[in-house]
């Protein structure tokens, strides 16, 4: 049984020290597509965290019974089944958000973070640690998504979660929204800025030259 310190490290490590987007550069495509609004960024975070945590748990529970030759197929089947469940739940209880997320919920099946943790961690680690690792990596992914979504929605549309924060000139206010921030390429610059900030604070994350 893992001790509390080890569980805490597995849970909190991916948020900054080993962030899947900022350090490992995984899951960037969805980060570009779903961060124009905080609402979609939050729902995508919850969806990916649930899929990663539960797929890690189930794969870890049967890891000793999966033949090496078909392990990827088994992992994909478990992940795909969980994604279908998540997608159906979203369509049932948050249909408007599900429409905005479009195909990106389905693409969780091929998300490098989910597949990477299943293969590199869950196949070698007991269920509880694997479950916590899934939650930690989901939270790390979400930390970047929500940070980018905060900047893009606030300064691109003057709102957060659809609630007006900065009064727009077009409605008699003072703020002129920056439309560039609502375009997907802006997320590249924001993610790059976050990576730069994190690696300035933690220089040990900078890759060695040569």
Curated annotation (Swiss-Prot):
The keyword Lipid biosynthesis is assigned to this record: no
Keywords: Cell inner membrane, Cell membrane, Ion transport, Membrane, NAD, Sodium, Sodium transport, Translocase, Transmembrane, Transmembrane helix, Transport, Ubiquinone
Entries under InterPro entries matching the protein: NqrD, NqrDE/RnfAE
Membrane topology: Multi-pass membrane protein
GO cellular component, one term: plasma membrane
Transmembrane segments: 14-34, 42-62, 72-92, 103-123, 131-151, 178-198
Any one Gene Ontology molecular-function term assigned to this protein's record: oxidoreductase activity, acting on NAD(P)H, quinone or similar compound as acceptor
Compartments it resides in: Cell inner membrane
Reaction catalyzed: a ubiquinone + n Na(+)(in) + NADH + H(+) = a ubiquinol + n Na(+)(out) + NAD(+)
Family according to the record: Belongs to the NqrDE/RnfAE family.
EC number: 7.2.1.1
GO biological process: sodium ion transport
Quaternary context: Composed of six subunits; NqrA, NqrB, NqrC, NqrD, NqrE and NqrF.
Protein name: Na(+)-translocating NADH-quinone reductase subunit D
Origin species: Shewanella loihica (strain ATCC BAA-1088 / PV-4)
Record's function text: NQR complex catalyzes the reduction of ubiquinone-1 to ubiquinol by two successive reactions, coupled with the transport of Na(+) ions from the cytoplasm to the periplasm. NqrA to NqrE are probably involved in the second step, the conversion of ubisemiquinone to ubiquinol.
Domain of life: Bacteria
Gene this protein is translated from: nqrD
């Amino acid at each position: 049984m893992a001790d509390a310190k080890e569980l805490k490290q597995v849970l909190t490590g991916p948020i900054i020290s080993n962030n899947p987007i900022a350090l490992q550069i995984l899951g960037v495509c969805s980060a570009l597509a779903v961060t124009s609004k905080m609402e979609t960024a939050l729902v995508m975070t919850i969806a990916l965290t649930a899929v990663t945590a539960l797929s890690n748990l189930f794969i870890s529970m049967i890891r000793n019974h999966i033949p090496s030759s078909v392990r990827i197929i088994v992992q994909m089947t478990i992940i795909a089944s969980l994604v279908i469940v998540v997608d159906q739940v979203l369509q049932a209880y948050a249909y408007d958000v599900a429409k905005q997320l479009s195909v990106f919920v389905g693409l969780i099946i091929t998300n490098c973070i989910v597949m990477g943790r299943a293969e590199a961690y869950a196949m070698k680690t007991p269920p509880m640690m694997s479950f916590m690792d899934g939650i930690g990596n989901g939270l790390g992914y979400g930390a970047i998504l929500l940070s980018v979504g905060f900047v893009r929605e606030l300064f691109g549309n003057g709102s957060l979660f659809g609630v007006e924060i900065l009064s727009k000139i077009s409605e008699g206010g003072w703020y002129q929204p920056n439309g560039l921030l609502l375009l997907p390429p802006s997320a590249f610059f924001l993610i790059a800025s976050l990576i730069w900030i994190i690696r300035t604070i933690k220089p040990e994350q900078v890759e060695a030259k040569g």
